Swiss-Prot record:
One cellular-component annotation, GO: cytosolic large ribosomal subunit
Entry keywords, A to Z: Ribonucleoprotein, Ribosomal protein
Family statement: Belongs to the universal ribosomal protein uL29 family.
UniProt keyword annotation of Ribosomal protein present: yes
Pfam (any one): Ribosomal_L29
A biological-process GO annotation: translation
UniProt KW Ribosomal protein keyword: yes
Record's protein name: Large ribosomal subunit protein uL29
Stored HAMAP family: Ribosomal_uL29
MF terms in GO: structural constituent of ribosome
Length: 63
């Protein structure tokens, strides 16, 4: 997910995206804890996507 794609979305869409990413992060953590996670790079990718969404939300709140 690119920041330029996120800037085109509304605040409501960004909040929905953030909620979905947090759920995905939770599921990945549970899979890692039980030893079922094969693609460990996904945890890092989701964490950074969450940071991107939160950054854009803060930018929109300040504007």
């Amino acid at each position: 997910m690119k920041a330029s794609e996120l800037k085109d979305k509304t605040v409501e869409q960004l909040q929905e995206e953030l909620l979905g990413l947090r759920r995905e992060q939770f599921n990945l953590r549970m899979q890692a804890a039980t030893g079922q996670l094969n693609q460990t790079h996904m945890m890092k990718q989701v964490r950074r996507d969450i940071a991107r969404v939160k950054t854009i939300l803060n930018e929109k709140a300040g504007a």
